Amino acid sequence: MAERFKILVLNGPNLNLLGQREPELYGKQSLDDIADSLGAIAKQHATALDFRQSNAEHQLIDWIQQAAKDSVDYIVINPAAYAHTSVALRDALLAVKIPFIEVHLSNIYRRESFRHHSYLADVADGVICGLGARGYEYALQAALTTLNNTDN
């Protein structure tokens, strides 16, 4: 079956430590577990899924810029701490004009006050936080619903 859509899932700093780092906040699933789960959902929907992680802001920006060249249809991004600091990430997402959903494993509004502001939230299609790894699945389902509705 031909793939109907391309979705890029980006993960920011320290998410490579999922399952080890503060499991009471971020859960016990590893990033590989999340990638496998999303890959299975994408396959059911004939969707190409590219799942990546970097601790480097410039790498995330390079991938976002490349996404436009690769005709990516949608981005799901967990910017991690870059949500609260990176105007450059915001600018890259605005520049490519690819719709995106912001995801956070923990509820950023139950945490330190500096985490309450996201530079991406007001330009995202939506924000999902505090639902753990399921938040990624909800974001992917929302992206697929949006793409299917615009594909008609």
Curated annotation (Swiss-Prot):
Keywords: Amino-acid biosynthesis, Aromatic amino acid biosynthesis, Lyase. The record marks 21 as: Transition state stabilizer. One of its GO terms (molecular function) is 3-dehydroquinate dehydratase activity. Its EC number is 4.2.1.10. The keyword Phosphoprotein does not apply. It catalyses: 3-dehydroquinate = 3-dehydroshikimate + H2O. Homododecamer. This is 3-dehydroquinate dehydratase.
